[in-house]
From Swiss-Prot:
Gly residues composition-biased segments: 242-255
The entry's keywords: Ribonucleoprotein, Ribosomal protein, RNA-binding, rRNA-binding
GO terms for biological process, alphabetical: translation
Biased composition range(s): Low complexity: 256-267, 276-285
Ranges of biased composition (kind: Basic and acidic residues): 217-241
GO cellular component: cytosolic small ribosomal subunit
Domain of life: Bacteria
Organism lineage string: Bacteria, Pseudomonadati, Pseudomonadota, Betaproteobacteria, Burkholderiales
General function of this protein: Binds the lower part of the 30S subunit head. Binds mRNA in the 70S ribosome, positioning it for translation.
Pfam families with a match to the protein in the record: KH_2 (PF07650), Ribosomal_S3_C (PF00189)
Region (Disordered): 211-285
Residue ranges of every copy of the KH type-2 domain listed in the record: 39-107
Annotated family: Belongs to the universal ribosomal protein uS3 family.
Protein name, UniProt field: Small ribosomal subunit protein uS3
């Protein structure tokens, strides 16, 4: 059921990591989880034009550390760092603890699934044909290093009366392979006909457990450098014949009694002649 389950949750113990990294007891867990959801919704609205890919939240020792991954870090920081300072104050008021905000730049937004989904929804809201937007995003992703991409759009596409689902795929998208680095993102386009949902899967190669080291494939493995051993009969100084040392019944024996040796080449095998003895004469004859 790799096609139905959430790709990130499916790979959490293997190649992915949690977006919220903290520990809480049973009494405080629900409240802290609700705060994380509230912070993410606030940042999504506040930084709508900053191309935010994802947000990670850490809570070390009565503090909070929030990392924002954005393709436009300058929009988040603002002029002379004013916007990020105001953002820290608002987040500290929400979480009621000191907050440190870090900005990480997304180098290739064309390969980020969340940014691809948001880009397609923005084009759909501007009345651009959904097929054109999807195929353009797929071409850009494959050109910049993605090994596979799948995009699905669902809703009243092109304003039709009955909602439907269409998807396109290019390259490989192995959803069942746990070591595959599958990036997944969703977004919604609010059009005059209704809401259109967009889902994006991007395959960026294979990874080892929670690391960036690529997995060596079968065709990329180096050849075995060990020196292969020659057959026993070809070894120098071996006085035994090529068939010596073989086990099994009849090993080392010559031909059976009364049987001719095995023919060599194209010579026809000899025919064994059988002579029957005459029966003994009856008594009294």
């Amino acid at each position: 059921m790799g096609q139905k389950i959430h790709p990130t949750g499916f790979r959490l113990p293997v190649t992915r990591n949690w977006s919220s990294r903290w520990y809480a007891n049973n009494r405080n867990f629900a409240g802290m989880l609700a705060e994380d959801i509230e912070v993410r919704e606030f940042l999504k609205k506040k930084l709508k034009n900053a191309a935010v890919s994802r947000v990670t939240i850490e809570r070390p020792a009565k503090n909070a550390r929030i990392t924002i991954y954005s393709a436009r870090p300058g929009v988040v920081i603002g002029k002379k760092g004013e916007d990020i300072e105001n953002l820290k104050l608002e987040l500290a008021k929400m979480l009621k603890v000191p907050v440190a905000v870090n900005i990480e730049e997304v180098r290739k937004p064309e390969v980020d699934a969340q940014l691809i989904a948001e880009s397609i929804t923005q084009q759909l809201e501007k009345r651009i044909m959904f097929r054109r937007a999807m195929k353009r995003a797929m071409q850009n992703a494959m050109r910049l290093g993605a090994q596979g991409i799948k995009i699905m759009s669902a809703g009243r596409l092109n304003g039709i009366e009955i909602a439907r689902t269409e998807w396109y795929r290019e390259g490989r998208v192995p959803l069942h392979t746990l070591r595959a680095d599958i990036d997944y993102g969703t977004a919604e386009a609010k059009t005059t006909y209704g809401v259109i949902g967009v889902k994006v899967w991007v395959y960026r190669g294979d990874r080892l457990a929670n690391g960036d080291a690529p997995v060596m494939r079968g065709e990329d493995r180096p050849e075995d450098d060990r020196r292969r051993r020659n057959p026993r009969g070809d070894r120098p100084g071996d006085r035994r014949g090529p068939g010596a040392g073989r086990g099994g019944p009849g090993a080392g024996r010559g031909p059976a009694d009364g049987a001719s040796a095995a023919p060599s080449g194209d010579a026809k095998p000899g025919v064994k002649r059988v002579v029957r003895a005459a029966p003994p004469a009856a008594k009294g004859e």
